[in-house]
Amino acid sequence: MRKIIIFTFLLSILWSQFKTPVELSAFIEDQARPGEVSSVAIKATMDQEWYIYALRDQGQGPVASKVSLSGDFIKEVGRVTENDPQEKFDENFSTMTRTHQGGAEFIAPFRLKKDLEPGKYNVRVSIVYQVCNSSVCYPPKEEFLDVPLDVVSGTVRTERTKMDTNVQSLYDGSGNINLDAAIDSGLVSFIFLS
């Protein structure tokens, strides 16, 4: 039993020494007014040999990247977009995948609540990604960033009201149930479809 505890302890020390080859940064470019749409720009940088998986449409095996936003001042989150991924056969998983080689950029829009007081806020950004190169894939990793947002008073500007929402079709192009969309749409829809 003592050997197992020592082994587990040493393994956890080694695991904590792992430094991801991905460096994340995020920012919000402009000030926003209550009720407006703003967006967080997230950048993942890494050496050219490394890649992360795209947001959607992954093959069997790899973990798609995921960007989530949170904060009590956020009314709704829109559909996260990304720069164009490369489609390629992944030797690590023996399947076709969509990846971002050497880096990626994501834009995560969100709508502020209308009754929000002007002031400084932090948008909590969660990024889940799996990073690989030609010979190794690390387990999926979740990182958090707090991104400052400056909310100023004023009426909602018309050009800052449109946003693609996260609504996905409950069925994919082949007629199969899109499980992620069913779960996102709520418990009742998920139970109904199951």
Which residues are covered by each model-predicted region?
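Extracellular/lumen-exposed scaffold segments
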Residues: 17-186
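Residue-level signature of transmembrane alpha-helical entry/exit and packing/kink sites
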Residues: 186-193
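Sec-dependent N-terminal signal peptides
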Residues: 3-13
